[in-house]
From Swiss-Prot:
Family: Belongs to the autoinducer-2 exporter (AI-2E) (TC 2.A.86) family.
Pfam families, alphabetized: AI-2E_transport
Primary location group: membrane
Record's protein name: Putative transport protein YubA
Transmembrane segments: 20-40, 47-67, 86-106, 175-195, 237-257, 262-282, 286-306, 331-351
Native species: Bacillus subtilis (strain 168)
Amino acid sequence: METLQTWSGRFKRFFLDNKFVLFLLVLLLIGLNILVFTKTSFIFTPIIVLLKTISLPIILTGIVFYLLNPVVDFLERRRIRRIYSILLLYLLVIGLITITIVSIIPFLKEQIMSLIDNIPRYVDVVENQTKQLIGSNFVNQAQQTMNINISDLATKVSDQAATIVNSTFTGVGNFIGALTEIIISIVTVPFILFYLLKDGRKLPVYILKFVPTRLKEQTYTVLSEMNHRLSSYIRGQIIVSFCIGFLLFIGYLIIGLDYASLLAVIAACTSIVPYLGPTIAITPAIIIAIVTSPLMLLKLVIVWTIVQLIEGKLISPQIMGKNLHIHPITIIFLLLTAGKLFGVVGIILAIPGYAVAKVITTHLFDWFKMQSHLYDEEKNENTPGHKV
């Protein structure tokens, strides 16, 4: 028995207390996982199809759950039974949606139709400005210097435009399929949300039933931290996006920018995605401002700068704080990579997914430090009474 324990201890020290061996072991495990996945990817096809089917309803349900659950908890603390609180909240939400559809949607529809009607005028303005630019000495000099043939360039642009139009018609079927999926998801969300609001608190207890007794406390800590990170991010990001949309709406009204309501709604929706969202949001506003006048473009830049300063210095620090502890460069790389791999869904899930993975990885690394002797010096430094 002692011999077995001795060999077990040597084996453990060999893998856990040797940085080089541990590094090779991690590389080996990663390589094996990649190899197995590439050779058996067909096995995961049904799972991927299932995940694609249920991902959108689950994402929408999770977002709405984190928004409404604090309200249900508040009503329950006021001695209103939870199921009655949920039903009351459903009635309020249905009322708000009805008011929005009746009052706001027609106004936005009017602005959208007006924008569509004015597109030919905008095209004419851009075309005239382009002709003036092409006829200027600056462009002629640039053409001679860079050896660019404007006619050939226009022909290539025309051919590319025709290709885009053809691909657009080809993608109509895909658009209809995606629209059907969205409608089905919206219909199923209220039912999933009801049971999640009603029994969501029992979910950690149910998960802990499958966890060994000695790991229950640590697992519960991990689940609680994951829940805190997700709830803080989702609620905070939506509130910040709403504030940005409202501030831009006020600013657009002050400077007299056309389609202020529509542009503010676009800004509020896209601002859910950090860093990249504001860039997408300002693009249509810049186009309309350029077509209007150079002075309007200057006013737009001033309004946008003021709103970004208010958001960065006042709103986000108060609402978001430093809950996720993710560096801005990391966020940008996450958004670019997830967008390339998984599209819009990847952009939306990149940051909360990374936050969850970071919580799990941090706790696993803490467990490893407790098991390994590689970090004994660090543990001694963190011990109470240790003097530096």
